């Protein structure tokens, strides 16, 4: 307990303390002091003190000794001194602790630096190295190592101890990677550069390769010329993991020198090989070579290689439809960068939802500081080249002027795609109208008729409401004027680029629309009106895709049209007397009019000429003949055809039309008659276009049974006829090709021959089965009277009927031959036609006979053959060497003389047997070949050749069978060895089965 007393200035005495106060003072000084006579003593505590304190203590002791009473002021001074002492001690202790902490921190930093250096020595990666980094759920990505001191605030937040800061190329992201997640860039380039084909990955690889090339060229140039160092100053880093203002780290010189290993002469050699082959093994190899050449140019002439810069977009021409998408992307860029920066942390990526992660990944594709043309989601901008192309294409336009001045032609650009929701009959229909659909519906076709042009206007694509209104007002005369006004407003001209569309599409756009109908009003005016919209059909069913300008397509169209005519005529039983009425006659004087195409192919030819006229009309309107000539010349002279596929298609179609009309039906048709169509095609055309004749009608009146029986007998006898009859039949078939010029002559014989050939082709069974089937059918069809009569007949009556029918057929054939002799055809025509109209069975027989004759001629060889067999591993002589060695013995068959690499053998064919024997004897005496292994000689005679072939085949069969038996015995032996004394039931059953099979095989061999 302390008592404070305030003394006034100049007071000599104060209140004297009581005994209690003296006792308290003695207690405070008990620990350090010594009690004297008066009871109070203060001593030093052993620490260094000041002189003031000592003097005060001495004075206090003196006062105490003198007076023996301690005053309050003295007590206060003692207490303050004690407190001051304690404060000084505490400050000294704190300073000592701070010094110790600083020393510990310095030691820790030194330890960390030492650890980092040890880690770098362990994994071998340094700051500035190019590496491939692998993060989970991402491919190997190119990047560069940076110092942790260069890390941004975002990177420091997710810093991980013992990992390296890697700044990724391309997308501007970063990652903290361990040594196990990294690979050297150059050593692993071939492996890691092919892990993905995405656009972002390829862009990152290209950027990394360019950066390495910059460092390589910098090292090469700076070594040669120090004054050019400023040209290769390091740029600023633009990455989310690196703070602003940091320059790109320099690469170690050891790494660059490892890429530049090689002799000086190899650079020139590599440049020559690249120039000749235009191929390189990798992108890095090409970049290194390019930088070497660029450094060489900089050292000699002061500047490097010419650089190619990709075309930049014109600002202000963005696609406005994608503005909203771009705004959303800009909002999510910051969040996306953070997410991509934290992609090394698997836990945070897994915590994100699927929708959030997908949206972030989509927004991350755009990073600041990188060109927009490398981003997958960028604004659609028009380049300067596209604008120039459109301006040049806009010069060629398809414009139509109004005939009476009523319709105004206005050139309009393609409008945007719009969606309208219209209500028709209470139902909502979503109609999506595009610019292409509007063009098709707003076609304006010009039709030339006698030199006067009539403009037929088709209304533009209307909505369903307008169509409904027009349908309702069809019967009203008052509404016609309103419709005309609305139609005049909606009609617009077409703007067509000739060079960007093919000939088929251009012809389709000019074609007259069948849905347009002209309607006349009371005032005499005409109004165009479109019919109701039909269901949309596939474009591949349109005549543009179905029409074929080739010879085969025209033949099919004519056959189809004529076959439909014949079928309709046969159903209605119309009587057509002349064949010239169904088919157009071919004019004989085609040379007098070479420009007019002949129309011998009927309606198909008319359609083709209409198609050609449309195409030529359009070419006259759009592409000039000069332009077409230039395109054809470029296609003929150019080593590589231009990449414009539209002009290529147009040239191809024009040339097909031109060639078909020149060589098929044009001026050269008379000279190239054989190229036009073969005789077989003419026969098919004549068969399809042949009308029904009177003779056929007479036969139809007879009974069906008799007709079928005659057909069967005729077909059966035609096969067994002599050569004379075969010639007659051939002459009958030749007559069919001339049916166009001679109307009704010999039609009955031709029809019978056609029917017989058809029956023979369809007939797959034998003649006996067909005759039995025909007899059964004939027994069912005739009436009861005919059945009774046939039962009465005996076999002799059947023979008589057959003889009568044979006489009739012979008479018909004789008449046909007489008529054909009058015509007097050239001999070569007579020979060609029968060969084409022969029966397929006879053709097959002739082919087989020809093949057998060829084989006989090939195998026929009267000389001897010397076979030389070499040991395995020896080199075989060439054919020329064999001929030189054995030609001195006699004449050789050089075609048969050859070496066989598979068998290590060679055979020499001598035309004379005696020469072969001489060569064989001399070869046995002295071998003409120099080889390490043994050489065997064998002579074959002509009569032994077939016998030896048979024996060789038999020997091969026997060896195969013996090998099979040996194999089976080995399998059985293995089964027994595997049993080891104890045989299971399964093994026993299997062994019995093998033995049974083996015995059966032995029995078969013995019997054979």
From Swiss-Prot:
This is PWWP domain-containing protein 3. SUPFAM superfamilies: Tudor/PWWP/MBT (SSF63748). Residues 127-188 form the PWWP domain. Belongs to the PDP family. Residues 87-122, 321-330, 473-490 have a biased composition (Acidic residues). One of its GO terms (biological process) is regulation of DNA-templated transcription. Residues 84-124, 307-339, 399-606, 668-874 are annotated as: Disordered. A motif (Nuclear localization signal 2) lies at residues 809-816. Residues 726-738, 842-854 have a biased composition (Basic residues). A motif (Nuclear localization signal 1) lies at residues 786-793. Disruption phenotype: Delayed flowering associated with reduced H3K27me3 level on FLC. The triple mutant pdp1 pdp2 pdp3 has increased levels of FLC, MAF4 and MAF5 expression, but decreased expression of FT. Disulfide bonds: none annotated. A motif (Nuclear localization signal 3) lies at residues 841-848. Together with PDP1, PDP2 and PDP6, interacts with MSI4/FVE and MSI5 to suppress FLC, MAF4 and MAF5 expression by regulating the function of the PRC2 complex and modulating H3K27me3 level, thereby promoting flowering. It comes from Arabidopsis thaliana. The gene is PDP3. Pfam families: PWWP. Interacts with DEK3. Binds to LHP1, MSI4/FVE and MSI5. Component of the PRC2 (polycomb repressive complex 2) complex which regulates histone methylation on histone H3K27. Residues 399-409, 511-522, 677-687, 707-725, 739-758, 768-787, 794-818 have a biased composition (Basic and acidic residues).
